[in-house]
Amino acid sequence: MSLGMMEEEDLAEYFRLQYGERLLQLLQKFPNVEEQSDSPSIQLLEKKKEAKIMQEAMEHKKEAFQRRMETLNLRWEELGIKEEQLKAHIQKFEQFIQENDQKRIRALKKANKERELKRLRLRELAKAKQEMMALRLEHQKLSVKLQDYAIFNKYLEKVVENSEFEEIHEVIARYKTLVSMHHDLMQSAQEGQEKIERAKARLARYMEEKDDEILQHNNELARLQMRFDRARSDVIFWESRWAHIQNTAAKKTLLLGTIKMATLNLFQIVSKQLKESTQVSLEDTHKQLDMIQQFIQDLSDIWTEVKKKEQQQVRM
């Protein structure tokens, strides 16, 4: 709001408090100027002089009022600056909330990806267990076969004599081959078991790390939610304050318009009573008030003189 608007508004309020309804009462109370045309001209000049003194006093008051309005205008400009700062703060905070929402969405996507990876590792672990069970079953079968072969050791010696084996070392070589196969199978089974144990350990560590990350993300989300709630409460509060300021400004603007209309009506009545053409603009409320004040002062002076004259005539 500019200084001119503030000055007109407070000036209207000032004269409304100073005079108020007394303007209309004085206009109704004083007789028509034409009916008092027989007042002594000398006394009228003296009253004019007194009115001039009163006018100078009013000018001093108006200067003091002008200084007060300048101070109020500075305060109003400071409020405007604070309002702009508040808007900038709200805009930055909305941008901050939007960025945090994007971070939260990325965190949720990452958590979903980690859970999917966890399910994949569990499936791999189940598959490794199945392979381990198959290796153990194969190992059991080979052990049974080995025992069966041991039972027929002596039989094999006899078989050498009556079989394709020409020497016993051929049977032993065959036995060593079977032992080597058994060893390879046992080693494969052990490597499979170790692989399963390592996979279990990695899975346990991975699950523990991801549980910690999920807990941290949940704590961060809770903290951001609290900040968002506080910020939303602040936004609602300042929106309410801004609406109140706008409503107050609208009411004061309406009141100022009403006062200007009343001042214009009084000015037109005064101009009609004076029967003089004036060059005062319809928008110049200050000059209108000055002329109204001068007219009221003149009427007051005339009325006082008339009363004195009537009292003197009554005494005579």
Curated annotation (Swiss-Prot):
Task: Tell me which Gene Ontology terms the entry assigns under biological process.
Answer: acrosome assembly; centrosome cycle; cilium assembly; spermatid development
The record's GO CC annotations read: centrosome; manchette; perinuclear region of cytoplasm; sperm head-tail coupling apparatus; sperm principal piece
Q: What is the protein's given name? A: Coiled-coil domain-containing protein 42
Effect of loss of the gene: Mice develop normally without obvious somatic defects but males are sterile due to malformation of the sperm flagella. Sperm cells display defects in the number and location of the head-tail coupling apparatus and lack flagellated sperm.
KW ATP-binding (keyword) present: no
UniProt entry tagged with the keyword Coiled coil: yes
Record localization:
Cytoplasm, Perinuclear region; Cytoplasm, Cytoskeleton; Cell projection, Cilium, Flagellum; Cytoplasm, Cytoskeleton, Microtubule organizing center, Centrosome
Q: What does this protein do?
A: Essential for male fertility. Required for sperm development.
What does the sequence similarity comment in the record state about its family? Belongs to the CFAP73 family.
Expressed, tissue-wise, as follows: Expressed in the brain. Expressed in the epididydmis and testis. Expression in the testis appears limited to adluminal spermatids that are engaged in the assembly of flagella. Strong expression is observed in the spermatids within the lumen of the seminiferous tubules in testis from 8-week-old mice, but not in cells adjacent to the basement membrane of the tubule, including Sertoli cells, spermatogonia and spermatocytes. Expressed in spleen but not in kidney. One study did not detect expression in the ovary. However, expression in the ovary was detected in another study.
Task: Tell me which species this is from.
Answer: Mus musculus (Mouse)
Q: Which Pfam families match?
A: DUF4200
Give the lineage: Eukaryota, Metazoa, Chordata, Craniata, Vertebrata
